[in-house]
Amino acid sequence: MIRSVSFSLGLLVVIGSFVLANKQQKQSAPPPPPKVLMIGDSLSVAGFGDAVREHLEHRIGRENVAFFASCGSSPENWLQNEQVFHTRCGYREKTPTTDVYRDYHNGRRPPAVATPKIETLIERYKPTIVIVQLGTNWMDQTLSDNHIRAVLARFVSAAHRGGVRRMIWIGPPDSSRFSKVQNRIYRLIQQSLPRGDPVIDSRRFTRYVSGKTGGDGVHYNSESGAAWARPVNASIDQVLAADIAARRKVASNR
């Protein structure tokens, strides 16, 4: 009788330990990686964009990265209520299911491509982080501060609508052509983004040398673009790490 009771108690202890261990194992399962949507202009169509996209794919997996770049575009061109912007100088799209590249070939202009809308992309890919590389094409336009602020307010609202996500804004790199107006564009972007959405100041990592960096004072060749991407990727990694840690904490408290 005593042996039977002892055996039963021992069996209960073993079963209880198994259940507890199984529960702890389920709780300690890592959360899914972040999902990233990146959009950009001509600077992302070329080498810089490829370097950032490939880094993200390596870091969190190709299935978690959606990348779009439209030459000549500015934030307003990505907004739902604005006229569709057809780029005629280059387009790049790389997602888990698509791979599109349009650029000049043997001096021939690429076919026009419609720039997608950020609201549609967010609905489709459901990102937890949105990376934006835009603002370059504002530097050669005579737009008022109020106009740019209004566009940025709508853009920020669209990027955050329908979910809790962070936005990382990659500011324009050093430009020998528009260096005088860059401070203004940066100031407006920084003032418009909410706390918690970092602006990466690319000027800290770049210096445009005509004939070496590129030929027009704005665009970066493949080598210079890759060099610019390295410190930008390091900055993005910090945000990704914080996002993963925060979601791991939430998962462990469930």
Residues covered by each model-derived region:
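Residue-level recognition of beta-strand->loop/alpha-helix junctions
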Residues: 67-69, 171, 201
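Active-site segments of SGNH/GDSL-like serine hydrolases
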Residues: 131-140, 153-186
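N-terminal secretory targeting modules
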Residues: 1-39, 43-67, 123-126, 232, ...
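Conserved SGNH/GDSL esterase-like catalytic core that processes O-acyl groups on lipids
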Residues: 33-38, 43-145
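Catalytic His-Asp segment of secreted/periplasmic serine-dependent ester chemistry enzymes
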Residues: 61, 173-254
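Extracytoplasmic/secreted envelope proteins and their assembly/folding machinery
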Residues: 49, 53, 115, 119, ...
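Active-site cleft segment of glycoside hydrolase catalytic domains centered on the general acid/base Glu
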Residues: 140-152, 215-220
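Loop/helix-junction capping segments adjacent to catalytic residues or to phosphate/diphosphate-binding pockets
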Residues: 45-46, 141-142, 149, 176-179, ...
